[in-house]
Amino acid sequence: MDASSISPDHAVTVEPLLAERIEVLRGPATLLYGGGAIGGVVNVVDKKIPTAVPEKGIEAEAELRGATGTKERAGAVGITAGEGQFAVRVEGMKRRTSDYDVPDWPGGKLEGSYSESTQGSVGMSWITPRGYVGLAFTHLESKYGLPGHNHEYEGCHPHGTHLHCGGHDHDHEEEGHDHDHEHEHGGVPYVKLRSNRLDLRAEYQDPFAGFEKIRVRGGLTDYQHDEIEGGQVGTRFKNKGYDLRVELQHKPIAGWRGVVGVQNAYSDFRAEGEEAFLPRSKTRSNGLFVLEEYQLNDWRFEVGARQDWQRISPSGGASRSSLSGTSLSAAAIWDFAPQYSVALSLSRSQRLPNAQELYADGVHLATNTYELGNADLGRETSHNIDLTLRKHSGDTTFSASVFHNRVKNYIYANTLDRYEDFRLIEYTQRDAEFTGVEGELRHQFTPVFSAAVFGDYVRGKLTGGDGNLPRIPAARAGVRGNVTWQQWSGGVEYARVFSQKDIASYEDSTPGYNQVNAVVAYRGRYGATGYEVYLRGTNLLNKLAYNHASFISSVAPLPGRSVLLGVRMTY
């Protein structure tokens, strides 16, 4: 719970360096966490609350790494100790990066792309043979620049559907101009962030008749970040709230296994200062969900359902939004031959608008936009079909997927007008559709060497031939080779990211680029300590590249060449 959903320049308070694993959930399983995740859900699993007492009384992990192009210096450590029925977890992380290198760019660096972050947590659990209950407190402090934050547009304001900037209307001939990065560099604003969170987690086996397990997850969050320019706090964002979910895993019923659960969340969001483009808003949400699975010979069936209720109460006299949404999903996986399977997923999902989409009204200089919300927005409804063919074992494996989504009343940021790199956007609803393919083919040529080809493509447009949707990622294709020999492993990957010319009104096309990445690693043991030393290179061709999906792609290109050296240890 932070401010990342309000703007792409607001950091997510999740630290990958301390994550145990990162999962991507698709199909009916996404309904465990929300009804509007058309493309899937990213679930970060951490170890801040122990779930078991270490067998030898203590376990530890540590990682150190440093990079060239970003000047990253980072370290993380986690220690779990336990005795009897109690276990304690302590972990910490510190990272610092400088403005990263960019080829063919004024000064050779992207001004304002630096970051600093420090995080620490302490967790404790009471553990029994049938489950555990634990608490953890996490404190995060972060500071990062805002690249592309341009105060030349401070005087821009809307007049109907047009922009007025610098005492004159915008020139409509600006539409579709090429990338131009000859801009003035002044003092770059930055964000200073603080977050405190208290987490509760509990699991218990066989809690009562008919159920195998109960899981409880909850948290209290106190989040604040200041946007600072010239030593003065220009905007302060605050978010306080809680989230709670309870899942019950039932015993098999006529062969069906699954979970039912409830979710409740509350947040009180405030934005104060010159960029406070949102009123204070209180959001209350509740959800009921069920996910079931059935195995029948070579077939596996999954079904899921979710009902959501959301109420957003803004200050300042704006109308309250009170909406509900119903989402349904089903999938069938058929292992039709040894090593082969085909999966078909169908879903009907509903997403409810957030406070930004409903109530925004003001200049947002971090994204070079003036944002207009629409308090009359309703739910969006998506009908999705996804077909996947896999060969999952043998020397040759592959996965190929095709999907099509039709969305009624799709909510998106529509650009009404543009002056240079500044846009007037309004959150609106239109019917839209998305079509995409992705695939990978891999072959194990020898016990040591394997190679793969991969690619993905998505097309997003308004229905009825009314134009393209903005910020749709460009198509990508590539090839990678991997080597594994004794304790060594390594790989090289080449990817071609194609130009994006299917653009919306007032949007620039983005040129394509080539990217080469490589990694080599060595794993070993020293007594009771396992270790891995790795060397990773990114954008080794040092190509100037833009991310079309970014609001500020033309003024904030991707990093240039960087080489990272790191070591990871476990005890």
Enumerate the language-model features and the residues they cover:
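Transmembrane beta-strands of outer-membrane beta-barrel pores
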Residues: 64-70, 83-85, 94-98, 128-130, ...
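Gram-negative outer-membrane beta-barrel transporters
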Residues: 258, 399, 403-407, 425-503, ...
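Periplasmic-side early beta-strands and strand-to-turn transitions of outer-membrane beta-barrels
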Residues: 5, 49, 60, 76-191, ...
